[in-house]
Amino acid sequence: MTMTDTASETKPFQAEVAELLNLMVHSVYSETDIFLRELISNASDALDKLRYESIAKPELMEKGGEPKIRIIPKKAPDTLTIVDNGIGMDRQELIDNLGTIAKSGTKSFISKLAETKDSAGLIGQFGVGFYAAFMVADKITVTSRRAGSDDVWTWTSAGGAGFEIAPASEEAAARVERGTEIVLHLKPDASKYLEDWQIERIVTEYSDNIQFPILLMPEEGEPRQINSASALWQRSKSELSEDDYKQAYKQIAGAFDDPAMTLHYRAEGRQSYAVLLFAPSTKPFDLFEPERKGKIKLYVRRVFITSEAELLPPYLRFLRGVIDSEDLPLNLSREMLQKNPQLAQIRTAVTGKVISELESLADKKPEDFTKIWDAFGPVLKEGLYEDFERREKLLSLARFTTTAGEKRSLKQYVEAMKENQTEIYYLVGDSLERLKSNPKLESATARGIEVLLLTDPVDAFWTSGQLDFGGKPLKSLSQGDVNFDLIPKLEQDQDKDNKDEAKVDEATVIAVIKDALGERVSDVKASQRLTSSASCLVAGGMGPDRELEKLLARANKGAGSKPILEINLQHPLVAALGDTKTDKAEAADLAFLLLEQAQILDGELPEDPAAFASRLNRLVLRGVVAHG
């Protein structure tokens, strides 16, 4: 050891930790039971790590006894001690693990915790469970010995601005042969956690399926095990109740909601493995982090290996659970995980099983499936873009809001298609309200044609894949030409059509607009989409849809392909362009107005807002609209 290593030292908390501790210390939350669940979960993780590291280094298990977790209540003074004989921590690990939070999303957690009283769910989601102990303790002492080390360190904090790290006393070092001892000096109003029955109640509710024995060491009476310590996923489905699965989900996922779907089965044959997966009923906070990492835990013969094995494709990353293999080697390295053919086979098989389970749920319990889709549909739709092999199945699972005002499957959409309708129409945008008022819907609405309204960011990407469903291609209403000639308008719209019909020289009007706008648009066309609006912007028939064009243009800071301006020849503004009384300056103003109002309706600002305002003022003052 160096001089610094042997000396007692006081260190400040990382800023986020200090803020988090302030919330915990002054907490008014009612779900304080969770502190014990979180500490037991951490102890279980430490035992898992020891078991894994001891595969390569058996000597790590020589001191400290069989893996277990002990809970020791003690009155006068009121302390609750949680002890594990797991991997333990050295000095730097104590500083890193208890003095800082490296996990992304911490600031988001703190802001959410300050806003809500659902501390239980948030603490479980964000993985900052150790600090929950400050809800019940005004001081915490952690003594730890790293497996295989002679050095023992003590970390102490009263939840203020910092903590003290020092070599452990001889007495404390003698108590901790291996692993970690956490002593909570309880607040006066937390003394109930010294009652044996309270401890048993919490362990039974939250931690019964922890794989290691949890021993209660009462002040009076003999120590006793208070959890079942069984790997629930290895048990038969017939032995388990719905409550068993709910408890297992909460323990495995660190969650407080109930699972929306449970998949439990055992595969036998060329490979043997057990699978227990859950779909949450609420969105995890990190669902859309750029890494798109899954949270499935890989075990080999009940030995925890990793939760970073990419056991499912990214579009199923919302699932939580366990896969326990009988055949994989225990010494899997990170590199081997990426290349192991057995693991790849497990991934393929389990992914297929998950899709089948979702199909079954959609068929037999549509309301339950809709809840999953509402929470995780944007993630599942990533598979439409990435998983060509399962695209058809994922399309069948997809549920879409439509102009009919309800969530529908593509099968339901196709069954309701109009006579002579050969395509499935959709429109992509960033807001349902804006889409519903989009002028590109007008001609379809006039014919009673249903249109899918897509508002998730991923929609602009997966729809670019030239997809079809049941032989019916998906067609964007903001790309290429549309032809509704074989589908008659509804009666009221036919009457309106006859009244609004106007005679305009198409070629003349288009030439005037092109001359005014120049290269600001790629083309000007008469529209088959519009019935009441004057203009709209669309993309060409080849390449990206209009919404994807806009996304790509923003990503390239303005560089992108030019849109096509479509005009409604029956609209008075357009008719005014063909009027011989309209001079060239007025015609240019009108042409720009057609472009700029189309941009606004498309969710964009005009290129020059000041010029747009001046132009609009001029037209209003001149009363040009009256020319129509």
Curated annotation (Swiss-Prot):
Keyword ATP-binding assigned: yes
Cited SMART domains: HATPase_c
C as annotated region, ranges: 551-628
Alphabetized GO MF terms: ATP binding; ATP hydrolysis activity; ATP-dependent protein folding chaperone; unfolded protein binding
Region (A): 1-334
GO cellular component terms, semicolon-separated: cytoplasm
Keywords: ATP-binding, Chaperone, Cytoplasm, Nucleotide-binding, Stress response
Domain of life: Bacteria
Protein name, as recorded: Chaperone protein HtpG
Gene: htpG
